[in-house]
Amino acid sequence: MLVDELCRLYSIIKTILNYGLSDFVPTHRLIFPLRIGSRFLLRVLNKHSQLTLGERFRLALQELGPIWIKFGQMLSTRRDIFPDSVADQLSILQDRVAPFDGIIAKMCIERAIGNSLETWFKDFQEIPLASASISQVHSARLKKNNKDIVIKIIRPGLLPVIKIDICLMYRLAKWICKFLPEGRKFKFSEVVSEYEKTLFNELNLLKETANTIQLRRNFKKSQILYIPKVYVDFCSENVMVMERIYGIPVYNLVALKKQKTNMKLLAERGIEIFFTQVFRDSFFHGDMHPGNIFISYKHPGNPKYISVDCGIVGSLNKKDKYYLAANFIAFFNHDYRKIAELHLDSGWIPLDTNIEDFECAMRTVFEPIFEQPLEKIPFSKILLYLFNTARYFNMEIQPQLILLQKTLLYIEGIVRQLYPNLNLWKSAQPFLERWMRDQLKLSTTICALKDKIPHWIDKIPELPNLLSHEFKRSCMLQKKIEILIRELRTQRTNHGQALFLFGVGATLVTSSIFLYIQDKYLKIFSIFLFVIGIFIWTIGWKRIIQ
């Protein structure tokens, strides 16, 4: 571990102790030394015991900085991991940071375009229009045509900080999986990996440029959604130049009503945009929170959405789309057997799952929901209940479905705010049923076969070699499994001792920090204790990772 990582780890541990986040850890599942340490030391240092666990978690992430705030925002959609009380607190995290100097922004732009800013732009505003943890946005004009534009710039010096924090997130995820059996079920390393991928996509504005161009192409002739033009010649990894849009923020209901916007039609079009992106295009905007959506000033009776900030996008393959649509339709029809069969056929739950038990669990969860009027049943909650119930049957985490759930949560929140009486199910059902009918048409099947036939013909001469190769590979795999079983038996013997040493070392380190903070007369002893703890911890850690 590097010195920078150790310093940052100390800061993280201190924040965890200050906010009493040890409450997330079920102590009965810890090894003995860590159980003693958590009981007698961690809770003593909790300076915010009067707050709820969710509030403490939110404040801790805020204190750790913007990268952790964004991580918390992502975790807020993972209600399969956290209870609602915690997820609700995480959902109000605000990604707000002080802007960096406009002169520095100007220098970043000039470095990216390889020329002085005045060569291509005029009326550049040093005070940003918006500032966030990853980037900030400045307004200007293009010299050649006098068009209003915005210039998005990645915050300088961000990469080294992000790399350290991501590395520590991986370490924490690994420790959770080592010491908490429940942690393995949630695959925290995969959660961090998904966050890392999202974060680095946002750091590369060329990816956002490509996403924006694709979405603009998909809705080029649309009367319901407008995506602003990107000026590709000026775009790079750190700078993006695009058309400036003018519209009313979707959350400004007063302004929308003042210009006599057709709110019912606007809400219906929000649902239409979502399902069009998911089922027609298989390419959807994954960050459609209210801050990224505007309504055009033109034609309030025939309202049009404007969407920006396309750094995060998602896609579903044909199989996922089919099973998702079929699940919703089965839900409309109270067909829980069909829902169970779909989960099994899609591979979302293990093949050895008892289908009757799964069907019964679905009925138990959803039948009470149907006591409410259909228009009051939230789409996003149905998806959440569906995933949470399936989780108890060891459903694999599907990252693309998590992003879809987050997007649906945003869209549904916006739509219900615009027109509370809208029946989302009535709006969505015809769309889903039409899409399902289209998939079953003979013409659709013929088109799919025409696409695959050349590939099949090409592979026919290779079949004998492929079969021989697969037979050899299965024999090799059998031998590897036998070797692995022998190695696992050996490792199991040593693992308990390694965990004990690791736990003793961690407890001594925690105790030394506590003594160092609390008692000025025991500072030398606490340093001595810290060194011994690190030594024992290192021995245990090396044995664990071997």
UniProtKB/Swiss-Prot annotation:
It comes from Blochmanniella pennsylvanica (strain BPEN). It holds the Pfam family ABC1. It is an enzyme of class 2 (transferase). Residues 123-501 form the Protein kinase domain. This is Probable protein kinase UbiB. GO terms for molecular function: ATP binding; protein kinase activity. ATP binds at residues 129-137, 152. The active site is at 287 (proton acceptor). Its EC number is 2.7.-.-.
